[in-house]
Amino acid sequence: MASTFYIVHHEFKAGKAEKWWETAYAAMSPGGGWDDAVAANKEKGFFNHSANAVTKTGPVYCFWEVKDGISAEEFQDFIDGPSGPGFGQDALMNICKPIDTSLMNGQTPYPPVFS
């Protein structure tokens, strides 16, 4: 069976955006641990293809791919948890919507990373 793709709608909780951006920029800077986190998440079956911020205070829309066999509930737990995009700060409200690729004749938003 194929991976599941999700669109995740992130809204910042009140007063949390500035600290979240500081943490995100630090993580993405050289030596910040970003590559290690991406590799660890991929090993767990989660891969973020893109993050798309509308404004600095949100919302942010992300495209995630989830390895076959991982439930929507497990994905939500990951997204809301310390290894997810909130960096353990409880900064985001996350709404995860699976993409029904059958509606587009199997077309996925990105080439799959999980076979």
Give short role names for the model-derived ranges:
Residues 1-59, 65-77, 95-115:
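Short S/T/G/P-rich N-terminal loop/turn motif that feeds into the first structured element of a domain
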Residues 79-90:
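A common structural junction motif
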